């Protein structure tokens, strides 16, 4: 690769196939929310991979799925728009699950929406299964996508094959100048990242009905008047029902305090300063199905 290359790559796949973890591993810092709950990525976050010979801008999309709510439909539209605007699509299929109808549907969607975009298939989570299972999955993936797509097995957790994947992706980008200055790792505003970190902490270890019903809005960020080493962050967690409010707050407010502590530590890392984090929980009835409320909450 003699001339500098730069371009956009998006990872797609069923929910929970390791797309956000992969983004964070390639960038080398946390820019995408990771959670073992499916469908937790809501915005297309661009993580940026800098090397001397190339720059890869990673667009992290929500998992593509058959939508059940207006929010689900908007997330799917966002994914499809992204498909047609990038240089390379990385289809993520985990090594530890058999290929199913969801994977086939997504492959069909990619070929229908972006037939000319370069496709690389990434077999994720290879650390979770023995070598023979990885080999069998590579064969199955090859049957699914045919001879045109390159297939790369990786583990974002252990780092195995990440350098190979980076080189494969970079090799498929067009020649061109860097889009972002060296050292910049994401173009997401800090407030969006803070909201995502709070959302991630709130989703940790809760029941299945909550992820889709939880939205976080940063209400105010301001330096503390009498202290230049402290920033006050006020955030509101919106849920759809009273019962969900109870889940988020927990007995005597214990769960909300845990969420606050976990999120505050991550936000302090992000901002590089001490943070006072104030969290409130409010109900926005059925916000996922209401266009006005979706707009107000940033979708």
UniProtKB/Swiss-Prot annotation:
Residue ranges constituting the KH type-2 domain according to the UniProt record: 206-285
Q: InterPro entries given for it?
A: G_ERA_dom, GTP-bd, GTPase_Era-like, KH_dom-like_a/b, KH_dom_type_2, KH_sf_prok-type, P-loop_NTPase, Small_GTP-bd
Keyword presence, GTP-binding: yes
Map out region (G3) in residue numbers.
60-63
Query: What does this gene product do?
Result: Exhibits GTPase activity. Binds RNA but is probably not involved in ribosome assembly in mycobacteria.
Q: Where is this region: G5?
A: 154-156
Tell me the Gene Ontology biological-process terms attached to this UniProt entry: ribosomal small subunit assembly
Note down the stretches annotated as region G2: 39-43
The family classification in the record reads: Belongs to the TRAFAC class TrmE-Era-EngA-EngB-Septin-like GTPase superfamily. Era GTPase family.
Which residue ranges does the record annotate as region G1? 13-20
GO cellular component labels: cell envelope; cytosol; extracellular region
Organism name: Mycobacterium sp. (strain KMS)
Q: Which Gene3D superfamilies match?
A: 3.30.300.20, P-loop containing nucleotide triphosphate hydrolases
Q: Summarize where GTP binds, as residue positions.
A: 13-20, 60-64, 124-127
- Organism domain of life: Bacteria
Give the matching Pfam families.
KH_2 (PF07650), MMR_HSR1 (PF01926)
Indicate what this protein is called per its UniProt record: GTPase Era
Query: Which GO MF term does the entry hold, naming one?
Result: rRNA binding
Point out the coiled-coil segments of this chain.
none
PROSITE patterns the UniProt entry points to:
G_ERA, KH_TYPE_2
Keywords attached to this Swiss-Prot or TrEMBL record, sorted alphabetically, are: Cell wall, GTP-binding, Nucleotide-binding, RNA-binding, Secreted
Residue span(s) of domain Era-type G: 5-175
The segment annotated G4 runs over 124-127
Where does this polypeptide localize? Cell envelope; Secreted, Cell wall
**Main location group:** other
| PANTHER family cross-referenced by the UniProt entry | GTPASE ERA, GTPASE ERA, MITOCHONDRIAL
């Amino acid at each position: 690769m003699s001339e500098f290359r730069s371009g956009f790559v998006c990872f797609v796949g069923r929910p929970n196939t390791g797309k956000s973890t992969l983004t964070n591993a390639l960038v080398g810092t946390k820019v995408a929310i990771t959670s073992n709950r499916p469908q937790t990525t809501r915005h297309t976050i661009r993580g940026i991979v800098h090397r001397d010979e190339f720059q890869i801008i990673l667009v992290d999309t929500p998992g593509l799925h058959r939508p059940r709510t207006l929010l689900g439909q908007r997330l799917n539209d966002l994914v499809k728009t992204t498909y047609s605007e990038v240089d390379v699509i990385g289809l993520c299929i985990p090594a530890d699950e058999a290929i199913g109808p969801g994977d086939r549907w997504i492959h069909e969607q990619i070929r229908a929406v972006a037939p000319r975009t370069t496709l690389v298939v990434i077999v994720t989570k290879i650390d979770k299964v023995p070598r023979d299972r990885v080999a069998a999955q590579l064969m199955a993936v090859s049957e699914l996508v045919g001879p045109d797509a390159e297939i790369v097995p990786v583990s974002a957790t252990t780092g195995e094959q990440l350098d190979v994947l980076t080189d494969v992706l970079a090799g498929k980008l067009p020649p061109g100048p860097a889009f972002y200055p060296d050292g910049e790792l994401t173009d997401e505003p800090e407030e969006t990242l803070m909201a995502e970190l709070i959302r991630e902490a709130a989703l940790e270890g809760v029941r299945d009905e909550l992820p889709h019903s939880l939205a976080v809005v940063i209400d105010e960020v301001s330096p503390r008047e009498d202290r230049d080493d402290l920033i006050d962050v006020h955030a509101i967690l919106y849920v759809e029902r009273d019962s969900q409010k109870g889940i988020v707050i927990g007995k005597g407010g214990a769960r909300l305090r845990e969420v606050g502590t976990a999120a505050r530590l991550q936000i302090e890392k992000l901002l590089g300063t001490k943070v006072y984090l104030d969290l409130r929980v409010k109900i926005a009835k059925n916000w996922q199905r209401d266009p006005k409320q979706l707009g107000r909450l940033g979708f």
